[in-house]
């Protein structure tokens, strides 16, 4: 039996909303995953890419990541990972550095065996280079095999990578495909193989409303009642609260109504995102944002989705270029 944590899209170094606090949140979320791994005594932590938000992470982000990985190494839990599109560099990868420090293993076409499971890796590959991609992997003698990859795979949203093609053209039969890139968690069965995303560990955009987390994956003959050999369970992470305030104003309402809607929520230490729709009077987003931060919000952003109509019409006339030049020359007495 092999038990691993499957995570990805940690985006360490992302100063969301230009906030140093949010930047630390992304590192803290990764540290929380490692804490759980150590507490649970899993056999490995598998990271499916985009460990960093940028290919040039700041020194503080690198040092913070190394500190977290050292705790994992001290607990004798291997960190297995692939390279995502956000962090991919033209030369050597940061993951290679961590491997030289004995803090990580970069997965590839050779198997990395943990207990009775062989792990393979597929870094992010741009769409333009996939036509010539060969899904060739070295053989293994483990009981189970898993592919870890980064990209937008079918049948999930925004897909541009055919999962069935990968599985059918691969010379290794995989029991599971552990993915990264799509920040929405999901699970599906493709060609009798479980394919899953754990989602991001922190909210990297306003569209990521659901709670964050990771997957706990078990490879065992008794997994999933003995039928599938693979059991995938989702586990939640406690992260920075986001408060979504949706305000649909009627014709007689304005900024006071928006403030009242904000007042109805506990915004302490939260990222507050206010969306205004409907009719009503104009509002001043900065004033509403200040109101939210005065009530304890870490960050507040207001989006006014209403279309402002005006009865005024503006006529735009374009001057003839040659006439404009002649007039300018004459005015200069040339």
Give residue ranges: language-model regions.
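Amphipathic, non-transmembrane alpha-helical secondary structure
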Residues: 27, 31-38, 63-66, 134-135, ...
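His/Asp/Glu-rich metal-coordinating catalytic cores
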Residues: 44, 53-196, 200-213
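Conserved residues at the C-terminal ends of beta-strands
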Residues: 48, 180, 277
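A conserved active-site cap/scaffold subdomain adjacent to cofactor or substrate pockets
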Residues: 180, 187-265
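Accessory, non-catalytic peripheral segments of nucleic-acid enzymes
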Residues: 227-334
């Amino acid at each position: 039996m092999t038990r691993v944590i499957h995570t990805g899209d940690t985006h360490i170094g992302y100063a969301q909303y230009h906030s140093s606090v949010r930047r630390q949140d992304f590192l803290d979320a990764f540290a929380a995953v490692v804490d759980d791994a150590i507490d649970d005594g899993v056999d490995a932590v598998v990271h499916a890419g985009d460990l960093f938000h940028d290919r040039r992470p700041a020194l503080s982000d690198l040092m913070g990541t190394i500190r977290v990985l050292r705790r994992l190494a001290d607990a004798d839990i291997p960190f297995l990972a692939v390279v995502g599109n956000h962090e991919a560099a033209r030369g050597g990868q940061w993951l290679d550095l961590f491997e030289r420090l004995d803090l990580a293993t970069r997965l590839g076409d050779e198997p990395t065996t943990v207990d009775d499971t062989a792990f393979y890796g597929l870094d992010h590959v741009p769409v333009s280079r996939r036509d010539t991609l060969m899904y060739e992997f070295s053989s293994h003698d483990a009981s189970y095999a898993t592919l870890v990859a980064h990209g937008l795979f079918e049948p999930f949203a925004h897909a541009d990578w055919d999962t069935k093609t990968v599985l059918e053209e691969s010379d290794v039969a995989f029991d599971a495909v552990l993915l990264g890139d799509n920040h929405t968690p999901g699970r599906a069965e493709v060609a009798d193989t479980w394919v899953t995303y754990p989602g991001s560990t922190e909210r990297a955009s306003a569209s990521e409303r659901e709670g964050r987390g990771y997957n706990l994956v078990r490879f065992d003959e008794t997994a999933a009642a003995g039928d599938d050999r693979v059991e995938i369970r989702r586990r939640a992470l406690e992260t920075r609260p986001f408060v979504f305030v949706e305000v649909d104003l009627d014709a007689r309402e304005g900024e006071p109504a928006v403030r009242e809607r904000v007042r109805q929520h506990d915004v302490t230490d939260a990222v507050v995102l206010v969306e205004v729709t409907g009719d009503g009077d104009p509002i001043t987003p900065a004033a509403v944002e200040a109101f939210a931060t005065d009530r304890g919000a870490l960050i507040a952003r207001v989006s006014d989705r209403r279309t402002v109509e005006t009865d005024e019409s503006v006529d735009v006339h374009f001057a003839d270029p040659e006439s404009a030049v002649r007039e300018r020359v004459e005015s200069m007495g040339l």
